[in-house]
Amino acid sequence: MIKMDDLNHHKNLYAGRGIEWMVEASFIAAAAETGDRHGLLFKNCHKFEFNKSVEPGEIISYCSTLVRCGRTSITIHVDLISEETGEIKATGYTTFVTVVANTHDKRVHGIVLDETDNREELEWRAEADSFFGR
């Protein structure tokens, strides 16, 4: 739920707080995929966009989907969704690298994307590839 402490001077969700929560939600998804929360390092946020304002008192959730796998990196697509209306209020991508926990040396994760024919997910995958010059 969006509280007064989460608002900007326009009385909408502060973008920094929304991005903070996006990174947390995508970290949880990345940790679930890799099975190793200690072996993940944040690398980058890509194209985080607010499509509609998020109002005080609004209940929101984040939906995270793995959309790109490099050798040592994974990219997660995240939607910020209004639980009341189902509207997607913001979208973005977050990339993490997989590392050896105590040395931070890069670690090959071995994760492979599953096959999909979902048009929206295919679009997310193509967009995520574009961040890396593919």
Annotate each predicted stretch with a short phrase.
Residues 2-3, 50, 96-98:
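Hydrophobic residues in beta-strands and at strand termini
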Residues 4, 10, 45-47, 105:
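Generic secondary-structure boundary/loop-capping signal
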Residues 27-63, 67-74, 87-93:
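Hydrophobic beta-strand-centered segment that forms part of the acyl-chain substrate-binding groove
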Residues 55-56, 67-134:
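HotDog/MaoC-like acyl-thioester-processing domains
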